Amino acid sequence: MARNKIALIGSGMIGGTLAHLAGLKELGDVVLFDIAEGTPQGKGLDIAESSPVDGFDAKFTGANDYAAIEGADVVIVTAGVPRKPGMSRDDLLGINLKVMEQVGAGIKKYAPEAFVICITNPLDAMVWALQKFSGLPAHKVVGMAGVLDSARFRYFLSEEFNVSVEDVTAFVLGGHGDSMVPLARYSTVAGIPLPDLVKMGWTSRDKLDKIIQRTRDGGAEIVGLLKTGSAFYAPAASAIQVAESYLKDKKRVLPVAAQLSGQYGVKDMYVGVPTVIGANGVERIIEIDLDKDEKAQFDKSVASVAGLCEACIGIAPSLK
């Protein structure tokens, strides 16, 4: 049986981490693509040389030509420029949109059957543009955001309650930006919803609000500490979880940026929602009930994403 082929577009910090994780999990053979000559080849060789120590079998190929991604089962896109301190994800729009146009053309030509996971920021606008540029069906193109945002929320909650991260579930909806909507009501510790834990005296509403805000600022906090780049371990782990659910048809319920066709009152836009990811890509979009306040927050988040998509059309009218 032929191994799966995983193509990584962009061989920076996230790309290298993705390649290593794909190897460790034996998800398939890996092609690292980058426009910088030597970078994907060097990282691929370095990771391949770790395989005898870690005990995994996979081929790693570095490439500077899109032809190398031909026939990929999964394509994960990290190409583009990362944030620097003081920048919002939205500041990257113009530069990274041009990158998405090139990446989309490469995928369209060489990997039209692939399941595509976009990580490039500003995420919701970039995955929307990438789907249009590539011409792939919407259920085969997603943005990695909600898994990461939920993971941050879960980690902060596990710290607050001094419990295992495995017993914390968390729910984050909306765009991958300052307007994301972490939902306390749908987040639990061992099945107990957060509002009940407040009543039980485990935490206070004020502390919970601070954790929710820290989740929104999670990426910026790391950018501020690193000063020369942005997060890469957690984003890579999150994208690999989505890829694994697709490749193994696990049907995991995962929050990703998916194209909506009327759910939550949104059409033809990519927004973070809970989905079922299996062998057909996005197999189901789960529409949960939102109260008035949550709906208002979600609508505000959607409006922010819509503004970015409009800005994209201003730069690249072909996206209309």
UniProtKB/Swiss-Prot annotation:
Q: Which UniProt keywords apply?
A: NAD, Oxidoreductase, Tricarboxylic acid cycle
EC number per UniProt: 1.1.1.37
Please tell me whether the keyword Oxidoreductase is annotated for this protein: yes
Q: Which InterPro entries match?
A: L-lactate/malate_DH (IPR001557), Lactate/malate_DH_C (IPR022383), Lactate/malate_DH_N (IPR001236), Lactate_DH/Glyco_Ohase_4_C (IPR015955), Malate_DH_type3 (IPR011275), NAD(P)-bd_dom_sf (IPR036291)
Q: Which residues cross the membrane?
A: none
- UniProt binding sites for substrate: R83, R89, N121, R152
Residues forming the catalytic site: H176
> Matching CDD domains, A to Z?
LDH-like_MDH
Q: State whether keyword NAD applies.
A: yes
- In this record, what's one Pfam family? Ldh_1_C
Annotated protein name in UniProt: Malate dehydrogenase
Q: List the disulfide bonds.
A: none
Q: What class of enzyme is it?
A: oxidoreductase
Instruction: Say which family it is in.
Output: Belongs to the LDH/MDH superfamily. MDH type 3 family.
Which GO terms fall under molecular function for this chain's record?
L-lactate dehydrogenase activity; L-malate dehydrogenase (NAD+) activity
Physiological role: Catalyzes the reversible oxidation of malate to oxaloacetate.
Q: Origin, by domain of life?
A: Bacteria
Organism lineage: Bacteria, Pseudomonadati, Pseudomonadota, Alphaproteobacteria, Hyphomicrobiales
